[in-house]
Amino acid sequence: MESKLRVGIAGPVGSGKTAIIQRLCENLKDRLEIAVVTNDIYTQEDAKFLTNSKALAPERIKGVETGGCPHTAIREDCSINRIAVEELEHKFTTLDLVFVESGGDNLAASFSPELVDVCIYIIDVAAGDKIPRKGGPGITRSDLLVINKIDLAEMVGASLKIMERDTLLMRKNLPWCFTNTKTGEGIKIIEGFLCNQIPSVHKMV
């Protein structure tokens, strides 16, 4: 098995994908060799955000402009992303982890197995507590489901208990977690999930 792990990060617009990647990079970059590919339709805003936040060195972040449906670029024709990932892997030969962040998409989004090894799907509480029971591949089949922005639950009238109940029903025994990127709550759970997936796990503490 190769030493690097390709991790797809998907979810609707505004769910907090980039913020979670930022947190993970900041927490893990001293222990793991990391790179990121971001997807936007017409800009490279997510790549710029990660660069400006100093989550990683600029040369480890590559922005891809898909120019169309974000789902197509990660599933039906993922060549533009595959090339970007391979360029980073060629440039940094000791990579442990490559994040591929999709453009904001709907609940039907999923990554091609040719592009990533595992998929983390992110939804947020602000979209309402009905989201988990709506289903879709991201909810039911992702390797890890993240329910982000739990700090907004009271503000938007969402019940975390309902979201937990429906998530357990939809995902059976598949892992999931609540997160708050402002406080860092739940981020360690994602790190632990990655720890169990990365061959170079000895670098984790």
UniProtKB/Swiss-Prot annotation:
Coiled coil: none
A GO term from the CC aspect: cytoplasm
Primary site of residence: cytoplasm
SUPFAM superfamilies to which the protein is assigned, alphabetical: P-loop containing nucleoside triphosphate hydrolases (SSF52540)
UniProt entry keywords in alphabetical sequence: Chaperone, Cytoplasm, GTP-binding, Nickel insertion, Nucleotide-binding
UniProt GO BP: urea catabolic process
UniProt subcellular location: Cytoplasm
Entry similarity comment: Belongs to the SIMIBI class G3E GTPase family. UreG subfamily.
Subunit structure: Homodimer. UreD, UreF and UreG form a complex that acts as a GTP-hydrolysis-dependent molecular chaperone, activating the urease apoprotein by helping to assemble the nickel containing metallocenter of UreC. The UreE protein probably delivers the nickel.
Its job: Facilitates the functional incorporation of the urease nickel metallocenter. This process requires GTP hydrolysis, probably effectuated by UreG.
Protein's name in the database: Urease accessory protein UreG
Taxonomy of the source species: Bacteria, Bacillati, Cyanobacteriota, Cyanophyceae, Synechococcales
Gene: ureG
